[in-house]
């Protein structure tokens, strides 16, 4: 309960002060400026998914499998929607608060709850297949390979569940710092490994069948005198491209690791709690300060930096066509050129804000607003 209070307070502090622990008088979010519009988004459909992210700092992300997009709201509504027409295929009200999701694949739709439950629904019908109590909040999407479901809890446990029954197969535990951000990155399954970023600033790989450690690598080293200064959570999730794993921590570093060994390929100073994207041979980072930066994926040199969205609480970036896309606290999605970071487009989606990464599938982009609005776009 102590950690819950600290984490909730820290999340609130980050929202209020624009993720800076040192400023005495904080500046307001940067005002949006005019630019020459080069890319225009075309809205294809819009649907309401319950209360969206709810009142807590949830990061409920939609997921696509085939022709269907799945989304969940904080109040417990889960929906399956035909991703090109917007037709609702099914909806399920779980009658309990959802805090992590959505994971999808191998016939399962997976969410986690504030009460520490993992719930598996049938992908085709929405019928509940099983529920498993894991005794800690689940704040990110579970992952599955069809045999094992891997869950990361708020107290940085990785838990392997049987995909058919929900029975626990293994548990991997780590030491949690005194103070952490509210949230965890979603675990990632790659071959025989389950990968996760931890609140300690480490990335770990464990055997997906047994939960035994394969390797661990520290990405960020806690520094500073106060517990707040020493927060180095990896909350933005991991990005796997070929054999390279990209990761970024809060108040730490962006880094590239060899996924097979955990060997550090490169690193550079960065601070982000939302993660990275890849495109054009580059890595894109939404910094905690509100700047968006393009890095060379081979050596981490900075290619460009756009700081015009300072203190606007940006979402994780996504790559859509030749553009980098981020959402912000006022519900805008901003499109930046991958080449030089200049603004090329802007669209307001949800006046309650856009906190989660836009989801891109081919020529379609799906944006889930904090208020529950799920909107599908193409480029005009």
UniProtKB/Swiss-Prot annotation:
GO terms for cellular component: cell outer membrane. It is a lipid-anchor. It comes from the Bacteria. A lipid is attached at residue 19 (N-palmitoyl cysteine). SUPFAM superfamilies: Quinoprotein alcohol dehydrogenase-like. Residues 1-18 form the signal peptide. Part of the outer membrane protein assembly complex, which is involved in assembly and insertion of beta-barrel proteins into the outer membrane. NCBIfam families: assembly_YfgL. Keywords: Cell outer membrane, Lipoprotein, Membrane, Palmitate, Signal. This is Outer membrane protein assembly factor BamB. Part of the Bam complex. Pfam families: PQQ_2 (PF13360). It is found in: Cell outer membrane. A lipid is attached at residue 19 (S-diacylglycerol cysteine). Belongs to the BamB family. The gene is bamB.
């Amino acid at each position: 309960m102590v950690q819950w209070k600290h984490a909730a307070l820290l999340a609130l502090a980050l929202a209020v002060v624009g993720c800076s622990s040192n400023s005495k008088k904080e500046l307001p979010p940067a005002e949006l400026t005019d630019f020459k519009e080069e890319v225009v988004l075309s809205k294809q459909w819009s649907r309401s998914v319950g209360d969206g992210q709810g009142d807590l700092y949830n990061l409920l992300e939609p997921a696509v499998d085939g022709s269907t997009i799945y989304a969940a709201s904080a109040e417990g509504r889960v929906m399956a929607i035909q991703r090109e027409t917007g037709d609702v295929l099914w909806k399920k009200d779980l009658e309990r608060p959802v805090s992590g999701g959505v994971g999808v694949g191998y016939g399962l739709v997976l969410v986690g709850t504030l009460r520490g439950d993992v719930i598996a629904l049938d992908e085709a019908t929405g019928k509940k297949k099983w529920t498993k109590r894991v005794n800690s909040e689940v704040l990110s999407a579970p992952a599955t390979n069809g045999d094992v479901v891997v869950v990361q809890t708020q107290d940085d446990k990785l838990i392997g569940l049987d995909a058919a029954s929900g029975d626990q197969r293994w548990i991997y535990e780590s030491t949690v710092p005194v103070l952490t951000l509210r949230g965890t990155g979603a675990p990632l399954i790659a071959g025989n490994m389950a990968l996760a970023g931890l609140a300690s600033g480490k990335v770990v790989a464990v055997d997906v069948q047994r939960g035994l450690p394969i390797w661990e690598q520290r990405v960020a080293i806690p520094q500073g005198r106060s517990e707040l200064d020493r927060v180095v959570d990896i909350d933005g999730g991991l990005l796997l491209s070929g054999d390279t794993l990209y990761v970024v921590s809060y108040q730490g570093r962006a880094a590239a690791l060899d996924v097979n060994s955990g060997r550090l390929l490169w690193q550079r100073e960065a601070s982000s709690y939302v993660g990275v994207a890849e495109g054009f041979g580059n890595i894109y980072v939404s910094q905690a300060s509100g700047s968006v930066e393009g890095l060379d994926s081979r050596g981490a040199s900075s290619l460009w930096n756009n700081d015009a969205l300072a203190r606007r609480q940006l979402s994780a970036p996504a790559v859509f066509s030749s553009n980098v896309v981020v959402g912000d606290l006022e519900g805008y999605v901003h499109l930046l050129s991958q080449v030089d970071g200049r603004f090329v487009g802007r669209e307001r989606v949800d006046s309650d804000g856009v906190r989660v990464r836009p989801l891109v599938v081919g020529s379609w982009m799906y944006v889930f607003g904090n208020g529950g609005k799920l909107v599908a776009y193409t480029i005009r």
